[in-house]
């Protein structure tokens, strides 16, 4: 005796159920979206490093979430057209995710800094202050970089890096590391304001995949690799 397989019922959302769902979760979704909007709007290194790190975590999580959703769409595609688009989107998302990791690893090899895995930019500005290398992300490689000392506090492009420095500690060169090459900026102007404050302007002078001589005698350290970073 053959048994007849009963097809599983197909569940569909009605308009009333969708409205009910939005009413129940509207407040929570609004709070979440407001939080994400504030983080994305005000998450800058020159304002708050803590908020900026949270912003980077949110941006970083976008990739795996996108890949998961596109794979889910492939498994539960409504029809062949949706399936085709879902497969294309999945392939594109995975390729871009792989490219991101490859570029980040290449930049990490060059700088040794975990900022290399920043999903927002592949530009890392680097300054050697008395043997201590500071590495921070910037959006683009500017033609000039400004380093400011305010009562011993060190700022570069408005980003606070450290304390206990004077204008005499500023190096002759700073660099911006990219995935494929290194940009060198030469100090072109320095102005002292009072006894403990002032600023220096660095101008882009050289671009290439090369190594700068170490500022630490006998260390064998290459400043282009920037291993001693914080």
From Swiss-Prot:
Stretches in topological domain Virion surface: 1-24, 77-84
Localization in the cell: Virion membrane; Host Golgi apparatus membrane
Record CDD domains: HCoV-like_M (cd21568)
InterPro entries (UniProt xref): M_CoV, M_HCoV-like
GO (cellular component) term, any one: membrane
Recorded topology in the membrane: Multi-pass membrane protein
Positions of transmembrane segments: 25-45, 56-76, 85-105
Pfam families linked: CoV_M
Keyword vocabulary terms for this entry: Glycoprotein, Host Golgi apparatus, Host membrane, Host-virus interaction, Membrane, Transmembrane, Transmembrane helix, Viral envelope protein, Viral immunoevasion, Viral matrix protein, Virion
Intravirion side: 46-55, 106-228
GO molecular function: structural constituent of virion
HAMAP family tied to this protein: BETA_CORONA_M
Its job: Component of the viral envelope that plays a central role in virus morphogenesis and assembly via its interactions with other viral proteins.
Subunit structure: Homomultimer. Interacts with envelope E protein in the budding compartment of the host cell, which is located between endoplasmic reticulum and the Golgi complex. Forms a complex with HE and S proteins. Interacts with nucleocapsid N protein. This interaction probably participates in RNA packaging into the virus.
Family: Belongs to the betacoronaviruses M protein family.
Full protein name: Membrane protein
Organism: Bovine coronavirus (strain LY-138)
The encoding gene: M
